[in-house]
């Protein structure tokens, strides 16, 4: 169940793919993404696998919800175009779904929700995902950002540990 392929211990690719196949879990994710889109909340989604990202994107598209999907095996042109559409909110695109692409080196000041659908045992990876939305005003981000985490993560990390890195930016204690 645990792999060390990324330089840190985390769930194996096979485990993440299995989690991504949960029909009930995906329906709950879809329901919440639809609500966020209806409220015009720019949202970054961290999927469990490439296939999971593609399934979520396809399901949203089928119901008429604009979104973009990015993953490592896409051409850089396709990836850059998808990111541009999200950043510019082109065609009212409020949702960007990704798998292992936008955890570092991606900045979009319009993100108002970070939606983590992939469990992780790595506090580093978890912090990187949170960091896409929790930049705070001093770092060019928003004052508020909604975090939606599928129950898999915060059972591993207590809340103080998960959020302590960002207290300096948000003025928290």
Task: Please report, for each region that a protein language model flagged, where it lies by residue.
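Short, surface-exposed connector motifs at secondary-structure boundaries
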Residues: 36-42, 63-66, 109-112
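Conserved interdomain linker/interface between the two RecA-like ATPase lobes of SF2 helicase motors
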Residues: 1-47
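A conserved SF2-helicase RecA2
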Residues: 1, 127, 135-173
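Phosphate- and divalent-cation-binding pockets in alpha/beta enzyme and binding domains
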Residues: 52-59, 104, 125
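A short beta-strand element within the Helicase C-terminal
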Residues: 94-120, 125-132, 144-150
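Short catalytic-loop micro-motif centered on adjacent basic/acidic residues
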Residues: 43-46, 69, 113-116
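Alpha-helical scaffold elements adjacent to nucleotide-binding pockets in ATP/GTP-utilizing enzyme cores
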Residues: 59, 82-85, 110, 125-132, ...
């Amino acid at each position: 169940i645990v792999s060390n392929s990324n330089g840190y211990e985390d769930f194996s690719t096979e485990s993440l793919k299995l989690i991504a196949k949960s029909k009930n879990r995906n329906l709950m994710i879809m329901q919440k993404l639809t609500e966020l889109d209806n409220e015009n909340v720019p949202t970054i989604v961290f999927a469990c696998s490439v296939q999971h990202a593609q399934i979520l994107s396809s399901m949203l598209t089928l119901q008429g919800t604009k979104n973009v999907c990015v993953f490592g095996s896409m051409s850089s042109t396709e990836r850059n175009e998808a990111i541009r559409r999200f950043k510019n909110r082109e065609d009212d695109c409020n949702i960007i779904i990704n798998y292992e692409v936008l955890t570092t080196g991606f900045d979009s000041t319009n993100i108002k929700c970070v939606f983590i659908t992939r469990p992780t045992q790595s506090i580093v990876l978890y912090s990187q995902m949170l960091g896409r939305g929790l930049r705070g005003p001093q770092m060019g981000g928003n004052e508020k950002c909604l975090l939606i985490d599928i129950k898999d993560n915060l059972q591993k990390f207590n809340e103080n540990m998960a959020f302590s890195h960002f207290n300096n930016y948000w003025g928290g204690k």
